[in-house]
Amino acid sequence: MLIVPFPLLIGMKLFILVLFYNLLILGFGVIKNHSIWIKLYFFVLFISLFQIFPDWYLSAQLEILVFPEDGFFKIGTVSAYMLGLWVIPLFIIGFISLRIKERYSIKIAYLSAILLSLIIFGLAEQSMWVFSWYPQNVFLLFDHLAIYIIIPEIILGFSSFYLFLKFKDNKIYFKIAIAFVVMLLYLGAANFFYFLIEKILVFNL
């Protein structure tokens, strides 16, 4: 999807990718009348919408994440397609972990959510150069992977799955509140591990 056969700026290509993925998930769930699929989609969508705040904070306040001009409009300092982009990894983590829970056990499902978060977000960070945003002024592993954000993203993936299981049958307004809590967990973890790794550990090396 990033290699579109006609000239488009990377921001528009990413918007098309995000829109296509979101419509594909929702459409499949509706056509198949897959209630748990639809519930998971909307829960991670709420989280993704709120994730604009951590991205905005990291880019505007800490200045360690850059969203350059990529041809798509911004919300603050963040490209607006990010509102739906977090759906992609979070839905994959949640759906696979749900299947593992059905086949094995809840403990193995929790472990899978942690491992999937590490793998998916780790690969995403490592391949960030393909996209339009990038980290700056932080310690990088293999030239692309920002160390400080690894644990916060694992917390994000695991807490999304864990809290979805706990509250999947609640009213939608309650799920929105829980999604906001997930965002706060991620934002707090990102802040803490940035301070710990960049200002304490790396500074003292």
Residue positions per predicted region:
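Aromatic-rich, lipid-facing transmembrane alpha helices and their immediate juxtamembrane interface loops
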Residues: M1-L205
